[in-house]
């Protein structure tokens, strides 16, 4: 057994090259044991490698590489490994080889990334030996069928040739394509390279045996290429593949931005016969009047009904097909279907609201209850609770009245056709001026009903804002207009809001500043930024500054590194409100990107800024950046949740709520639980609201602590001595937990993985309830119906069932609260004589004996009852339109005997086009009527009575 390598090392000093070669071979065999000893003479081995005439110089490089590896000098080790050429065996499983390959890939990646950012002439040449090892690694991955690993390395090293080759050579091309698309959506931070990858994916998808148009369009949304999408839709219509075109249109509406959709609509309009403007489509420069609107609706209905009875061979005219596609893309169709779903499946428990109403004793909690009611009934059009409690509702005065009126907009969200009739009593009238708070709230409500889908209502709100007589109506009008014209970047709307901002009125200015951001959402408009930041630095009103702080951030939505210069200047501003705006701008620009630089900036500000509001905003903003990977958020904010600063603790709670919304994440709930007992009341408020955001739509089975939190909300609300702040949080939490009649969830991304812009905006503005309660209503923008809606070729809902392959209780609605039974009044105890007591004792003994005889019978009866209790089935059939929670989608299938086949997997959910495989007549789901005030039709006057003779007695 060798105890020293000294003898072998001494051979390196010999003159004979063969002895040196022998020594190197021996050293290679023992280097792992004697590397420390060999390291003292490593210079001799290096000299041998540098000697061009030495035959085994590659072997010298290999030994030197191993010595440096053991010394921890990985860079030198890598250099010598490259010098070893083929002697460095990439297929070896040793720790040395694995480490050097990792270093090699890191080094190669770094060089490739640096080169990618340089112009063509300045690119540095990459060491061919380095590339050779990386290529061998790629081949090894392919040989071992480790395709995901190869795709990961190919994307990191920017090798699109290998990326494409790996996908095409894999044994599961659709699976690899889906994996690659997911990587593009969630992990890629460089926009330019991501676009190149998406182009490759589009090419592969299109070259498949059966082109996958649905996923191609998802890629094209990311590439911001509406023209290509329009071309695909036209191609599908020409090929008579209408159902696929409709499915793509629904997916586009759910995932694409307003600008993108309006470009596609514009392109479709220019193809073939010209088409009348479609009601509801946003982003058109001129909006049709209400008369045209009703005309186009009528013709639309006539054309669609004309084809119901036709044979399958007769295809509709191209004009009608394009009309339908535009109706879907404008969002009108999806909004109508979601409204139908929410009205039909409304499962609100009014008992919860009644108990809360009976417990509240002050105006703040009164407002909170009104907001909670609107959340619970969001989109259901059911205002029953308000009608039943008109006297209680009338207690709302001033701004509380404004909030209460606006809450109707949340209840009737999406109920667009009758919006003006519904709100008629609350809107400004020419004849007599009503309550300004009511009128302002009414205009805000109209905006909430038409959020992100303005159409004709934009012009109505524009005129109302022009003619508004006081600051309260202007406040509501600005918010309503901002919501309806969200993301349209319409110049006339922008100019009017800017005029309102420049009036230097605090109440008007706050809403106008926010509305400017909503209208210019994500536009990165330099003029808008200049106007808003310039005015923010001039104004003395804190309210206006607060509105602009959020507005500025919204203009930079989704702009990533393009917003860095603005973020830098805002973060350096001496005004804390503008620094807070910097935090929100980071949140909006990098939302959903998981960008490390953005996270580092927020964490730094969270612990270093001198202003509490800025620190709180910085921590809250973490939730927006991390929402694609909610499991990461608890570890990032866990230390912040224990901060000595209560504002940071509040921010940590809200960050968890935003990031893990709707997931039921156990770690997040475990962090929030101790915060519900925090000594500071507003931290408790944040923890209560965040817990509801996380546990929305969760059941006892999917999230065991949900009932415990329900009881906690109730306890806080009913405790007379608890603080108003905590009560406000608990009441809002109740509303969020049961939102939309138990049929909606909160998610910041669409079903297909795109960032859902209205949700992000809604949640950001919702967090501003800290300063201004009426902004709580913005959370309604983030509510997404959890539904599967199947449609036939005529875009009607057929009667069809879906099979949920799990026990019904797993995703069931929560049991309603029981009405408490009235307690019987206790009888006053009477004096008992000793004789009576003895007599009663004897009677009891008799009864006992009889009971013993009866026991057998009762036991038998119990057994019978247990037998009757049937075991729970392992599946459940759900009727179309079905309430299907996100986790339930995985177990959803079509019944085997079903005549319909879905155009895309049911596991994605949402609106799905169904292909009918039968010739039989279809049964359709009857639409249900919306609730709310109806305009009473004039009754016909009764006929006069028959003539008669009056005889006076």
From Swiss-Prot:
Regions of compositional bias (Acidic residues) in chain numbering: 936-953
> InterPro entries, alphabetically?
26S_Psome_Rpn2, ARM-like, ARM-type_fold, Proteasome/cyclosome_rpt, PSMD1_RPN2_N, RPN2_C
Give start-end positions of Basic and acidic residues composition bias: 290-303, 842-852, 859-872
- One short Pfam family name for this protein? RPN2_C
Q: Where is this region: Disordered?
A: 279-318, 839-881, 930-953
Look up the coiled coil feature and give its residue ranges.
Answer: none
GO cellular component terms listed in the entry, alphabetical order: azurophil granule lumen; cytosol; extracellular region; membrane; nucleoplasm; nucleus; proteasome accessory complex; proteasome complex
**In residue terms, where are the PC repeats?**
403-436, 441-474, 476-510, 511-545, 547-580, 581-616, 617-649, 651-685, 686-726, 729-761
Which residues does this entry mark as bearing Phosphoserine? 290, 315, 834
Residue numbers bearing the N-acetylmethionine modification: 1
Q: Which residues carry this modification: N6-acetyllysine?
A: 310, 720
Q: Which residues carry this modification: Phosphothreonine?
A: 273, 311, 830
Q: Single Gene Ontology BP term?
A: regulation of protein catabolic process
Q: Name one GO molecular function term.
A: ubiquitin protein ligase binding
* Top-level taxon of origin: Eukaryota
The record describes its quaternary structure and partners as:
Component of the 19S proteasome regulatory particle complex. The 26S proteasome consists of a 20S core particle (CP) and two 19S regulatory subunits (RP). The regulatory particle is made of a lid composed of 9 subunits, a base containing 6 ATPases and few additional components including PSMD1. Interacts with ADRM1. Interacts with ZFAND1.
Q: What does this protein do?
A: Component of the 26S proteasome, a multiprotein complex involved in the ATP-dependent degradation of ubiquitinated proteins. This complex plays a key role in the maintenance of protein homeostasis by removing misfolded or damaged proteins, which could impair cellular functions, and by removing proteins whose functions are no longer required. Therefore, the proteasome participates in numerous cellular processes, including cell cycle progression, apoptosis, or DNA damage repair.
Q: Which family does it belong to?
A: Belongs to the proteasome subunit S1 family.
Tell me the protein's name.
26S proteasome non-ATPase regulatory subunit 1
> What is the protein's species of origin?
Homo sapiens (Human)
């Amino acid at each position: 057994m060798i105890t020293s390598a000294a003898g072998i090392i001494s051979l390196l000093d010999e003159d004979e090259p063969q002895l040196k070669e022998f020594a190197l071979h021996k050293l290679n065999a023992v280097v792992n044991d004697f590397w420390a000893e060999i390291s003292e003479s490593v210079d001799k081995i290096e000299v041998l490698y540098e000697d061009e005439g030495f035959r085994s110089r590659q072997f010298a490089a290999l030994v030197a590489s191993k010595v440096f590896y053991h010394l921890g000098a990985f860079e030198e080790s890598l250099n010598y490994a490259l010098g070893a050429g083929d002697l460095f065996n990439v297929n070896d499983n040793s720790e040395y080889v694995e480490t050097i390959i990792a270093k090699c890939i890191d080094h190669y990646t770094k060089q490739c990334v640096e080169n990618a950012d340089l112009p063509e002439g300045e690119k540095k040449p990459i060491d061919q030996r380095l590339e050779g090892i990386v290529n061998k690694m790629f081949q090894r991955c392919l040989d071992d069928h480790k395709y995901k690993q190869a795709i990961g390395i190919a994307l990191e090293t920017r090798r699109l040739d290998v990326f494409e080759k790996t996908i095409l050579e894999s044994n599961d091309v659709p699976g690899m394509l889906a994996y690659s698309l997911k990587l593009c959506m969630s992990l890629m931070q460089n926009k330019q390279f991501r676009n190149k990858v998406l182009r490759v994916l589009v090419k592969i998808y299109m070259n498949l045996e059966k082109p996958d148009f649905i996923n191609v369009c998802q890629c094209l949304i990311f590439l911001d290429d509406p023209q290509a999408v329009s071309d695909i839709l036209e191609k599908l219509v020409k090929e008579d593949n209408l159902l696929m075109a409709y499915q793509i249109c629904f997916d586009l509406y759910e995932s694409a931005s307003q600008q993108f959709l309006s470009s596609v609509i514009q392109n479709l309009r220019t193809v073939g016969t010209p088409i009348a403007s479609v009601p509801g489509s946003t982003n058109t420069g001129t909006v049709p009047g209400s008369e045209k609107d009703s005309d186009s609706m009528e013709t639309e209905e006539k054309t669609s009904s004309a084809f119901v009875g036709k044979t399958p061979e007769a295809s509709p005219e191209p004009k009608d097909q394009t009309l339908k596609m535009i109706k879907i893309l404008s969002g009108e169709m999806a909004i109508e279907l979601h409204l139908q779903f929410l009205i039909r499946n409304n499962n609100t428990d009014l008992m919860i609201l009644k108990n809360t109403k009976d417990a509240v004793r002050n105006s703040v909690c009164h407002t909170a209850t009104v907001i909670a009611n609107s959340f619970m009934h969001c989109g259901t059009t059911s205002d029953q609770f308000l009608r039943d409690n008109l006297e209680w509702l009338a207690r709302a005065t001033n701004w509380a009245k404004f909030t209460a009126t606006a809450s109707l907009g949340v209840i009737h969200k999406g109920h667009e056709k009758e919006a003006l009739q519904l709100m008629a009593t609350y809107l400004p009238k020419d004849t007599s001026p009503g309550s300004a708070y009511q009128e302002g709230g009414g205009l805000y409500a109209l905006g909430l009903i038409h959020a992100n889908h303005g159409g004709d209502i934009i012009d109505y709100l524009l005129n109302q804002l022009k003619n508004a007589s006081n600051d309260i109506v202007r406040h509501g009008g600005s918010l309503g207009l901002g919501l309806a014209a969200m993301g349209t970047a319409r110049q006339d709307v922008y100019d009017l809001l800017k005029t309102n901002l420049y009036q230097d009125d605090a109440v008007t200015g706050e809403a106008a500043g926010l509305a400017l951001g909503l209208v210019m959402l994500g536009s990165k408009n330099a003029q808008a930024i200049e106007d808003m930041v310039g005015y923010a630095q001039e104004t003395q009103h804190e309210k206006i500054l607060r509105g602009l702080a959020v507005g500025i951030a919204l203009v930079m939505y989704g702009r990533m590194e393009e917003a860095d210069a603005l973020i830098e200047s805002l973060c350096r501003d001496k005004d804390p409100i503008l620094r807070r705006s910097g935090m929100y701008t980071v949140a909006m620009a990098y939302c959903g990107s998981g960008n490390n630089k953005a996270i580092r900036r927020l964490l730094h500000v969270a612990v270093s800024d001198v202003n509490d509001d800025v620190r709180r905003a910085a921590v809250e903003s973490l939730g927006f950046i991390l929402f694609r990977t909610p499991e990461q958020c608890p570890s990032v904010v866990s230390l912040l949740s224990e901060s000595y600063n209560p504002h940071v603790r509040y921010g940590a709670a809200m960050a968890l709520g935003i990031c893990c919304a709707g997931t039921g994440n156990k770690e997040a709930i475990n962090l929030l639980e101790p915060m519900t007992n925090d000594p500071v009341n507003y931290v408790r408020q944040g923890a209560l609201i965040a817990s509801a955001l996380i546990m929305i739509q969760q059941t006892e089975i999917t999230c065991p602590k949900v009932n415990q939190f329900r009881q906690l909300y109730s306890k806080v609300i009913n405790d007379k001595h608890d603080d108003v702040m905590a009560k406000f949080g608990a009441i809002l939490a109740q509303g969020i937990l049961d939102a939309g009649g138990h049929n909606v969830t909160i998610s910041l991304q669409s079903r297909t993985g795109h960032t859902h812009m209205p949700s992000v905006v809604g949640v950001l503005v919702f967090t501003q309830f800290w300063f201004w309660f009426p902004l709580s209503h913005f959370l309604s923008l983030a509510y997404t119906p959890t539904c599967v809606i199947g449609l036939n070729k005529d875009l009607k809902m057929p009667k069809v069932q879906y099979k949920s392959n799990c026990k019904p209780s797993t995703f069931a609605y929560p049991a309603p609260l029981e009405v408490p039974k009235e307690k019987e009044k206790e009888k006053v105890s009477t004096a008992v004589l000793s004789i009576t007591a003895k007599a009663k004792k004897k009677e009891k003994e008799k009864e006992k004996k009889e009971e013993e005889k009866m026991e057998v019978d009762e036991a038998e009866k119990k057994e019978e009852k247990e037998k009757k209790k049937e075991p729970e089935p392992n599946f459940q059939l759900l009727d179309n339109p079905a309430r299907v929670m996100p986790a339930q989608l995985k177990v959803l299938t079509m019944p085997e005997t079903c005549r319909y086949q879905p155009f895309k997997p049911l596991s994605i959910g949402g609106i799905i086009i169904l292909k009918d495989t039968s010739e039989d007549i279809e049964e359709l789901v009857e639409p249900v009527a919306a609730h709310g005030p109806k305009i009473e039709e004039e009754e016909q006057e009764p006929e006069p009575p028959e003539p008669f003779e009056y005889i006076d007695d």
